[in-house]
A protein has these predicted regions:
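Primarily residues marking transmembrane-helix entry/exit sites
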Residues: 2-3, 32, 103-111, 248-256, ...
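C-terminal ends and interior cores of transmembrane alpha-helices
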Residues: 71-103, 339-370, 382, 388-406
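Transmembrane alpha-helix termini and helix-breaking/packing motifs in multi-pass membrane transporters
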Residues: 21-28, 81, 85-94, 160-186, ...
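Juxtamembrane intracellular "pre-TM" segments in multi-pass secondary transporters
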Residues: 1, 199-274, 295, 394-403, ...
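Substrate-agnostic recognition of the 12-TM MFS/MFS-like secondary transporter fold
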Residues: 1-20, 38-76, 102-171, 182-198, ...
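Multi-pass alpha-helical transporter architecture, strongest
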Residues: 83-84, 185-201, 345-355, 483-523
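Membrane-helix interface/capping residues of multi-pass secondary transporters
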Residues: 32, 62-63, 174-175, 300, ...
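Short amphipathic helix-loop junctions that connect adjacent transmembrane helices
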Residues: 18-33, 134-135, 284-303
Length: 523
């Protein structure tokens, strides 16, 4: 039931994130401005509120957190879909009211509701995938690894199929029908997920037992030197989590500070930071890389095929994770995954200097070449007037003649590296995810994972800033090299964590009996 609930939630999220981007483009005259604003608002809100969301997850019963997050998320998407339907149906009439300011109000409402839905989705992800499944597996590391891998496989499949499904509806019908489809899906999904999560909560009694968050004056601060990897030591006689700020007028500021401090003092801090650094990259199947591929003559159908292959390699990474963890242990699995990831990315570095690469350093220093300004350059993200949507695929119309690359070796090496690297990437991601689950005090899981989400969004913002600073295809090689440097830094942080972790005696998760005794002490 937890898998079905997770699949429905992920499917709805993937459909919505794809559709809202297309809707905003269509609403603003096929311009990327609204989409860019939406992206910044979403990233900024999670960055600022991640710790608060996590703290809210920690302080409230598990069933109330899951139900509230689910309701807020689906209701926000439903209302937003209704607003979008009205805007699409009566756009000309709305634009004529208040000299067009009603249109601005509608755009603002859409972006705010979509952002609220994303925040609720973040809370639900932290609650279910970072806390619930740990308890459901009975604190069994093998079962936890299998459950994490299965959830990630579901995520990989929905990442491909969900946008394709809603894209077909929008293409064959209309944007209004697409909004209606998403609206209906969310209402049905809300009911099913609510029932399934409630049933899981009743079936697993341990979910109803949750240690309270220590307040100032109720728990002594735990010194970093006294922290160990095992949950037994952490929850033993001196295993209470550090105190957190109580509610009050300065609750938000104190919670954010306490959340970041809690994140910093975790034993797995370097591993979490290493994972966050992997978000600063253009080496993925996002709008940046696909835009670059189009400028290099890659057709939309071929790109869709490559995305499908990348999903398969991602699934291979989840399978490899479970086998490596069983054979070599969790920490060593991260080391092997890191090495595999970096080795595959060397192909991307080679693509920068291979035949067919458009990299031209003179564009960064035009004063060295008087003719640099006369060089024809294309932005990584083309104007939407030159493209159209067809079955979730963007196809170029009327590509300038003579702009085809001399050789496709560079682009082949690039995508070969990106696709194969996903095996190590997803195995590493699962490794760090489980390390966070195993090594974070139960009453701090929410706030620490909330800060981790904030870090991920922060590093993701940096890669967009990189593209804004160097937006031409001729700059893409520089972005590739910078991305590999960030990824290398992230894996280096993990290597430092692994070295430190291996010097400590391995901690054991408590048995059900010890777990119950510990919770009795906390309560």
């Amino acid at each position: 039931m937890i898998y079905v609930s997770g699949a429905l939630s992920m499917w709805g999220d993937r459909m919505w994130h794809f559709a809202i981007s297309v809707f905003l483009i269509e609403l603003y005259g096929r311009n990327l401005l609204l989409t860019a604003i939406f992206g910044l608002v979403v990233a900024g809100s999670v960055l600022l509120l991640g710790a608060l969301i996590g703290d809210w997850v920690d302080r409230n019963p598990r069933n109330k957190v899951a139900h509230a997050s689910l309701l807020v998320q689906n209701i926000s998407v439903t209302v937003c879909s209704i607003v979008l339907m009205l805007v699409f149906l009566y756009k000309q009439w709305i634009e004529s009211i208040w000299d067009g300011w009603l249109t601005v109000v509608c755009y603002t409402v859409v972006i705010v509701l979509a952002d609220v839905a994303n925040l609720a989705s973040t809370a639900l992800t932290i609650a279910i995938q970072r806390d619930w499944i740990v308890v459901i597996t009975g604190y069994n590391r093998g079962h936890l690894a299998g459950m994490n891998a299965t959830m990630r496989r579901i995520d990989q499949v929905t990442n491909i199929l969900a946008p394709l499904a809603v894209g077909q509806v929008m293409t064959l019908a209309s944007n209004v029908i697409g909004c209606g489809f998403i609206l209906g899906w969310n209402l049905v999904s809300l009911i099913v997920e609510f029932i399934f999560l409630s049933r899981v909560y009743r079936i697993v009694p341990a979910l109803s037992v949750k240690p309270p968050v220590p307040e100032d004056g109720q728990a002594s601060l735990e010194r970093p030197a006294e922290r160990t990897e095992g949950l037994v030591e952490r929850r033993g006689s001196q295993g209470q989590c550090p105190a957190r700020a109580p509610g009050g007028c300065c609750y938000g500021d104190l919670t954010c500070k306490d959340g970041w401090r809690a994140y910093y003092r975790q034993d797995v801090f370097l591993a979490g930071m290493g994972l966050a650094f992997l978000y600063t990259t253009v080496l993925g199947f996002d709008c940046i890389t696909t835009g670059y591929a189009y400028t290099q003559g890659i057709s939309g159908s071929l790109l869709s095929l490559l995305m499908g292959v990348s999903a398969i390699t991602g699934l291979m990474g989840t399978v490899m994770f479970t086998k490596l963890r069983k054979a070599y242990g969790l920490v060593n699995t991260g080391i092997i995954s890191s090495c595999l990831h970096l080795c595959c990315l060397l192909l991307c570095v080679c693509s920068v200097f291979a035949p067919g690469s458009p990299m031209d350093l003179r564009l960064l220093m035009p004063f060295l070449d008087a003719n640099a300004n006369s060089t024809l350059v294309e932005p990584l993200l083309p104007d939407r007037s030159s493209i159209h949507w067809t079955n979730n695929t963007v196809l170029f119309e009327n590509m300038p003649s003579g702009m085809e690359p001399d050789s496709y070796i560079s682009i082949i090496l690039l995508f070969l590296g990106v696709i194969t690297a996903r095996i190590g990437l997803w195995s590493f991601d699962l490794t760090v995810t489980q390390l966070l689950q195993e090594n974070i005090c139960e009453s701090e899981r929410g706030v620490v994972n909330g800060v981790q989400s904030s870090m991920n969004y922060l590093m993701d913002l940096l890669h967009f800033i990189m593209v804004i600073s160097a937006p031409q295809p001729q700059h893409f090689g520089i972005l590739v090299i910078i991305s590999v440097l960030f990824i290398t830094t992230g894996h280096t942080m993990y290597f430092l964590y692994a070295r430190k972790a291996k010097r400590k005696p391995a901690g054991l998760w408590p048995s059900a009996k010890v777990q119950e005794q510990t919770r009795t002490q906390v309560n």
